């Protein structure tokens, strides 16, 4: 599902532990790290997509987490030209994302990256909240900065 402007609706997931660190996942067979994220299917709400992607990518169920916050609007990034599939219709030029800040309620051993036949990640670790800004691929960096900045007060509220 791609919107009229060429952006694919998507959810981004920032999963935190009790000490405010965030889950940072390594893309399978690559030295590239990112937050879990995934597309929103037709007739699926962002929250429904969040829980589906959370299960597909890190093996967690709704009862394993608590939603702390969500970005107010859509945050967009454009794909580099080399990643745009110019012969696909409709043309997708980037992603528009709703970002969710979650607190892990269950034991971290519940995190599993191998529950689907096509896992996206093969490893993960806890990192400091702002660490991903210096590590994520450049074309996603501004969206990460905006999401982390908007959601940070909710993490610091420590409720």
From Swiss-Prot:
Function field: Accelerates the degradation of transcripts by removing pyrophosphate from the 5'-end of triphosphorylated RNA, leading to a more labile monophosphorylated state that can stimulate subsequent ribonuclease cleavage.
CDD domains: NUDIX_Ap4A_hydrolase_plant_like (cd03671)
Ranges in a coiled coil: none
Record GO terms (molecular function): metal ion binding; pyrophosphatase activity
A Pfam family per the record: NUDIX
Gene3D superfamilies hit by this protein: Nucleoside Triphosphate Pyrophosphohydrolase
Cofactor(s) this protein requires: a divalent metal cation
Name of this chain's protein: RNA pyrophosphohydrolase
Annotated keywords: Hydrolase, Metal-binding
Record EC number: 3.6.1.-
PANTHER family in the record: GDP-MANNOSE MANNOSYL HYDROLASE, MUTT_NUDIX FAMILY PROTEIN
Family note: Belongs to the Nudix hydrolase family. RppH subfamily.
Gene that specifies this protein: rppH
Enzyme class: hydrolase
SUPFAM superfamilies: Nudix (SSF55811)
Domain Nudix hydrolase: 6-149
Motif position, Nudix box: 38-59
């Amino acid at each position: 599902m791609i919107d009229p402007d060429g952006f694919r609706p998507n959810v981004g997931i920032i999963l935190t532990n009790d000490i405010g660190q965030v889950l940072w996942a390594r893309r399978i067979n690559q030295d590239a790290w990112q937050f879990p994220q995934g597309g929103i299917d037709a007739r699926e709400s962002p929250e429904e997509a969040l829980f589906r992607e959370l299960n597909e990518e890190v093996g967690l169920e709704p009862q394993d987490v608590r939603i702390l916050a969500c970005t107010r609007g859509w945050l967009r990034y454009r794909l580099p030209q080399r990643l745009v599939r110019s012969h696909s219709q409709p043309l997708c030029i980037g992603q528009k994302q709703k970002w969710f800040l979650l607190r892990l309620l269950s034991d971290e051993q519940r995190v599993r990256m191998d529950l689907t036949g096509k896992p996206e990640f093969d490893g993960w670790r806890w990192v400091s909240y702002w660490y991903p800004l210096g590590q994520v691929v450049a074309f996603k960096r501004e969206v990460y900065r905006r999401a982390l900045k908007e959601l940070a007060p909710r993490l610091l509220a420590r409720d």
